[in-house]
Amino acid sequence: MDKIIDISNSKSKIFQNLLKYKAGDKEEGIFLAEGEDMFDEAYKSSSLLATIVPNIYDKRYVTKKTFHLKDELYRQLSSYKSLPKVICMCKKKMSDISSLGEKAIYLDGIQDPGNLGTIIRTALAFSYSSICLSYDCVSPYNSKVIQSSKGAIFHMPIIKEKLINIKKLNYNIFITSLDGEDEKNILSLPSKSILVFGNEGHGVKKENLSLGRKIKIEMSGIDSLNVAISASILMYRFK
C-alpha cells in the first residue's frame, strides 16, 4: 500500500537525513537521483527505495514510500534550476572485484564528476562489463556523476579496488600513457582485459604504470585529450 509522508519542517530528522543523502559521498548507503528518467532507471534496476515529490505532484511518482515536501524544502534537495517532478531515494550498489567481467575499465584518480559520469554511460553503451575505481576517485554517487551518467549508474557494476590486485587475477592490462605505443598495434582485446585511464592532470600513477602494456592514441598538433573523450575513443575501438 502506498504511503505518503508530509514534511513541512526543515528541522525534522527525516529532512535532515535527506540533505545528507543529497551529497551522495557519505557512507549511509543511500543517494538521491533527480528527474523522470532517473525514476524509470532506478525502478527498472530495483534501486528505488522511495520517492520525494514537491507540493503539487504527479501521482505516477507516488510509490510504497513517498515524501511530500513544501516547495521551499524540495528546492534545497534539488541541484536543478527548474525543479524536477520527482527526486528518487536510491540504494547504493557497489560491487566487488569478482564482478570485473571479461572487459572492464579502470579509472585511476579521476576527479571530475562529469568525466566519470560520461565514462560510465559510454562503457554501458559499448557493452563493457564493469567500471573499477581507484580509492581516490570522485564518488560515483556524486550528484553530477549521476546526472551525467544519464541513468547508466543503475546498470553498470561499480567497483573500488587497487590495480595491483587486479593484476594478481591475471588480467591483461592496457594503460593509457603519453609514452605508450600506438593503440593501433593491438588488433583486439584478449579475454580478461582492462583499459586504464588516469587523472585529468597527472595521468596514471607512477606505481601503476608498470603493471601493464602502455598504449596511446596517436594525435597531431596536441599532446592529449580530455579523459572522457580518450576513454570513449578507445572503448569504441575495442568494443
Model-derived regions, located:
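Structured adenosyl-cofactor binding patch, chiefly the S-adenosyl-L-methionine
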Residues: 122-126, 137-138, 142-154, 206-239
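Active-site regions of enzymes building and remodeling cell-envelope glycoconjugates
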Residues: 61-74, 102, 171-173, 188-194, ...
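Boundary-proximal intrinsically disordered activation/regulatory segments immediately upstream
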Residues: 1-55, 137-138
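Amphipathic alpha-helical repeat scaffolds
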Residues: 35, 111-119, 224-230
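Short acidic-hydrophobic, aromatic-tinged amphipathic segments that line or gate anion-handling sites
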Residues: 2-8, 67-70, 156-164
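Glycine/small-residue-rich loop that forms an oxyanion/phosphate-binding "nest" at active or ligand-binding sites
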Residues: 66-94
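Active-site/ligand-binding-proximal alpha/beta "capping" segment
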Residues: 175-223
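RNA substrate-binding interface of SAM-dependent RNA methyltransferases
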Residues: 94-180
